Amino acid sequence: MKITRVLTAVAATSALALSLTACGAGGTAAPEDNTDKKTITVGFNPGPYQQMFEEGIVPILEEDGFEVKIEEFTDGIVINVAVAQGDIDANIMQHPVYMEFVNAQEGIDNAGLVQIPTPNMALFGGKKSTLDEVADGSTVTVPDSPANLYRGLLILREVGWIDFEDVDDPNTADLSIITDNPHNLQITPIENAQQVPSLQDVDYSTVQGNFILAGGLDYADALALENQPTEFSNVVTVRSADLETPWAKAIEAAYKSPEFIEFVTSNDDFDGFNLPE
């Protein structure tokens, strides 16, 4: 298996993103036509999706005659701008709600190509070990990004701890939508990456799936799993103009192939992942 890896420096790519933002990424010159390309460059943020792609998808693409290059990023905006500009062909790291948020913010036109297996967000106990131990004033952390905060609130509603007004756009959600909090839960949004390290300091936390895996938590210890809405299932992201290209269709077919599904379901590394319908 031949995979070329490039670590993309945040400083350099951030400067690019800022320049695109200033003039509108959507207003830049379109990338050269890449309809018949045989080398596919895919970007990843830290998380489980790169391993899944390299071990489960790349062999299929190579059998189809493609060479694959990997670029590693650490920023969700930069990696999307890189797709829009054509610096990379695709990224695999986000759900459509976040993708649309970045599209609107950056003035770009990326699209979801195919849903991929995605780990559930889950509720974990910190100082408390069961749902029954919830008490007046219990402390709960949720992700601080609006869309993932909304997912956290959905779990808290599913276990009967709160109620809130549904929103049409999860990217607008904040704690002000809560309408009923009978336990007077002290709900605090915090950075995703801090949820597992801070778990010992709070009673409960709703933790995003990739941070569950990266933080060494076990889904068997989760107190509740989200009923994952489709819009929060991660996707392969490409430029809208590339959706029908042969290389994009090859990626889509690989993710839908029986070989890949067998790879995921037989691999303990991907326990807790939801398969696309």
List PLM regions with ranges:
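C-terminal motif of bacterial Sec signal peptides marking the signal peptidase cleavage site
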Residues: 18-22
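Ligand-binding "clamshell"
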Residues: 101-113, 128, 201, 206, ...
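A conserved helix-loop-strand patch within extracytoplasmic ligand-binding domains
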Residues: 113-162, 261
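Periplasmic-binding protein-like
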Residues: 148-157, 247, 255-276
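A bilobed periplasmic-binding-protein/Venus flytrap-type ligand-binding module shared by bacterial periplasmic
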Residues: 120-131, 233-247
